[in-house]
Regions:
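Structural recognition of the beta-strand scaffold that forms the well-ordered cores
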Residues: 14-19, 34-36, 59-64, 93, ...
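Short beta-strand elements in bilobed, periplasmic/extracellular small-molecule ligand-binding domains
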Residues: 59-64, 79-101
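Hinge/cleft segment of the Venus flytrap/periplasmic-binding protein
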Residues: 82-83, 172-219
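Hydrophobic alpha-helical segments within soluble ligand-binding/sensing domains
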Residues: 34-59, 103-105, 152-156, 172-189
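Flexible loop/hinge segments that line or gate small-molecule binding clefts
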Residues: 4-41, 52, 59, 153-161, ...
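Hydrophobic alpha-helical
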Residues: 2-11, 78, 97-158
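Structured segments of extracytoplasmic/periplasmic soluble domains
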Residues: 7, 11-14, 18-21, 49-57, ...
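Short, solvent-exposed amphipathic alpha-helices that sit
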Residues: 42-46, 70-89, 103, 107, ...
Length: 219
């Protein structure tokens, strides 16, 4: 029922919110602690890598997912990560790939067709990037059009190893689960001090060596 959060709160039961944050009011009123990946940082790392890969700038496309706050943070981080070279990057398209492979593939095909000088895609997650990579492959442009992603899922790592992804920054769901579990255990055990209401764990770029060693796992 809609009153369930109040019932949980009244019963003195802690709520640990992981990965995707509930709305701000609910965090304030009901959540003991939120634990997620630093989405802005993940985007920033990818933007910095793209700026290194294209020092003279490039025509790029962004497949976003504006209805999800974390994905908006990733795009903002990415744009800031381009840094001083940001003005050299021409965003020829920014469209909602719905964080999904099929929708992103269809959009990417149209973007590639309409923009013969396109040099790279930034996608907000691996399913979206896998769709873009499939469109790039269908156009025989693997290696010519870069695909930059965030997640580093097993499928994303394989795509990196296969040369279909150029770079990928990681989500850290395993670390999130471990952190939240330990925090909850501590809380239930009687230590109810919460240093930070919201905890954002660091992202990093997953390079091929790490991808090879952890290809079947999340981090």
């Amino acid at each position: 029922s809609s009153d369930l959060p109040n019932e949980i709160k009244d019963a003195g039961i802690p709520i640990f919110n992981v990965d995707t944050a509930v709305i701000e009011d609910d965090i304030e009123n009901f959540v003991t602690q939120f634990v997620g990946t630093n989405a802005y940082m993940a985007g920033q790392l990818v933007g910095e890598q793209m700026a290194k890969d294209y020092p003279d700038g490039a025509d790029i496309a962004i497949l976003d997912f504006p209805s999800n706050e974390s994905c908006v943070d990733r795009v903002n981080g990415f744009l800031d990560g381009l840094g001083d070279n940001k003005d050299k990057f021409n965003i020829v398209a920014q469209q909602d790939g719905e964080a999904a492979l099929d929708a992103s593939m269809s959009l990417a095909e149209d973007i590639i067709t309409a923009n013969t000088d396109l040099q790279a895609f930034f996608c907000i997650n691996d399913p979206s990037a896998l769709g873009a990579a499939a469109a790039v492959k269908a156009a025989n442009k693997t290696g010519q059009i870069g695909v930059y992603s965030i997640d580093a899922s097993p499928d994303g790592k394989q795509a990196l190893l296969d040369g279909e992804f150029t770079a990928v920054a990681c989500q850290v769901p395993v670390q999130i689960a471990e952190y939240a579990f330990n925090a909850a255990q501590k809380y239930v055990g009687g230590d109810t001090t919460i240093d930070e209401k919201k905890v954002y764990l660091d992202s990093h770029l997953v390079l091929k060596d790490e991808a090879k060693q952890t290809v079947n796992d999340w981090q």
